A protein has these predicted regions:
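Nucleic-acid modification enzymes, centered on SAM-dependent nucleic-acid methyltransferases
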Residues: 1-299, 318-345, 352, 359, ...
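Local beta-strand N-terminus motif with an aromatic residue
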Residues: 302-303
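Hydrophobic beta-strand segment of the Class I
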Residues: 306-307
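Short glycine-dipeptide loop
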Residues: 331, 367-373
């Protein structure tokens, strides 16, 4: 039922060859740099023209002692070696408190896409990483940077743009999601504008090329284009290490990062080019359904083999995570049919078991007699394992083989099921 997953599968199977894809990406990136490159122009420490690689933003905090504002980056972190401090000494009153006792500063701004005033966390750009003539550099944000960013913040949204509401569930946190109700609020104004214009730019290409370029954008989007991009501190590192969004959640750190989207696209395109190359010599027909597996379209006894990787109970709310990409497609996953345990959707373990049973029953129906299904599953809770076991046994399938394979420290259990 996943809209993003179905779109990705359909697009990779659209018979575009690797050379066509590479030519399209090269042309797309060239056009994007010509039309949007000015959004990331900056100057190095000597005043020479350069390009932004990324900018660290910092939450502004409120001192619990004197109620004055201070920068988390300036007062709660250190460089060379990098560390996040457990305490902060207020630069105004000199009092020291645990970092967690400093509340975030808030600001009222007019959201011109929503056409109303909103309250959000106050964040400020603090450190710029750039490149000039192939040489990388970094420096503190200066007044010229602040003027440019303020100007971008005050720009109107595109006339054709519309608000796209976030449907919150288990992942919403009152702290770091404060003021985020719509898609555009997950981005800096600059990166949302660039992403919107890039999306519009894809519409100049034929359908199969357009969708390939859109998939490229979406593969980079939630991990690297939003405020969920972050920096981390590694032991004895001289500077912060840039990393993408934390997987499986919609976490925004106290030090979100604004990355230059244009720089990442060409690098991100390489695995897609390789995938198209691998598929060039494939024969046969591939049919992709964006529908629930509780009611399959395949005929009874028509399938030789099934592979499935069902949601692991309450482990990850996939539809909630994927909406950051799916909202760009103007179509999101139907959560009513999502097989997970979810208090926000009022789905219990019993509901999960019942829906999973229906899927396994359908697998049993479409499989040929004495043919197999492989299932990958993991759960850390006994009640979820019990639900999974009952779903299999009640479906007409039987377990004929199991194996355990560790993945990132978690046991993954592939099961071989046979239709009997």
């Amino acid at each position: 039922i996943g809209v993003y997953g179905s779109f990705a599968a359909k697009t990779l199977a659209n018979r575009l060859n690797a050379k066509e894809f590479r030519c399209a990406v090269d042309n797309f990136v060239q056009q994007a740099e010509m039309e949007l490159g000015q959004y990331y122009k900056t100057k190095d420490v000597k005043g020479n023209e350069g390009v932004v690689r990324h900018i660290i933003l910092s939450e502004v905090l409120i001192c619990p002692e004197c109620d004055k504002e201070l920068s988390y980056f300036e007062n709660g972190t250190k460089r060379n070696p990098v560390q996040f401090t457990k305490t902060i000494t207020c630069p105004h009153c000199g009092k020291t408190h645990d970092t967690d006792t400093f509340k975030p500063a808030l600001e009222n701004i007019y959201d011109s896409l929503l056409k109303k005033e909103i309250v959000r966390k106050k964040r400020e750009p603090v450190w710029v990483y750039g490149t000039t003539n192939g040489k990388n550099w970094d420096r503190k944000v200066n007044d010229e940077d602040r003027v440019l960013i303020k100007m971008l913040e005050e720009q109107e949204f595109e006339e054709s743009d519309i608000p796209r509401e976030i449907c919150w569930g288990e992942l919403h946190r009152t702290g770091y999601h404060l003021g985020i109700t719509h898609l555009h609020q997950f981005y800096t104004k600059r990166n949302y504008t660039v992403m919107f214009k890039l999306w519009k730019l894809t519409e100049r290409y034929p359908n199969n090329v357009r969708e390939a370029l859109q998939l490229l954008l979406l593969s980079y989007n939630s991990t690297h284009c939003t405020l969920m991009t972050r920096v981390v501190a590694k032991r004895n590192a001289k500077d912060f290490v840039l990393t993408g969004a934390q997987s499986g959640v919609l976490y925004i750190s106290k030090l979100p990062v604004e990355k230059n989207i244009l720089l990442g696209l060409k690098r991100k395109s390489i695995p897609f080019e390789e995938a198209y190359g691998l598929l060039e010599k494939c024969t046969g027909e591939l049919i992709i359904h964006n529908s629930s597996s509780e009611k399959m379209l395949e005929k009874t006894g028509s399938i030789d083999f099934v592979f499935t990787d069902p949601p692991f109970g309450d482990f990850i709310p996939y539809a909630e995570v994927n909406q950051i990409n799916e909202l760009w497609l103007n179509h999101t996953t139907d959560r009513e049919k999502e097989i997970i345990i979810s208090p926000s959707q009022e789905k219990s373990v019993a509901d999960y078991q019942w829906m999973l049973t229906r899927v396994f029953t359908e697998i049993s129906r479409v499989l040929k007699p004495d043919h197999y299904a492989a299932v990958v599953f993991h759960a850390a809770k006994a009640k979820i394992w019990e639900a999974f076991e009952h779903a299999i046994l009640d479906s007409g399938l039987a377990v004929c083989m199991t194996s355990i394979q560790g993945m990132r420290g978690l046991p993954i259990i592939p099961l071989s099921l046979i239709h009997i």
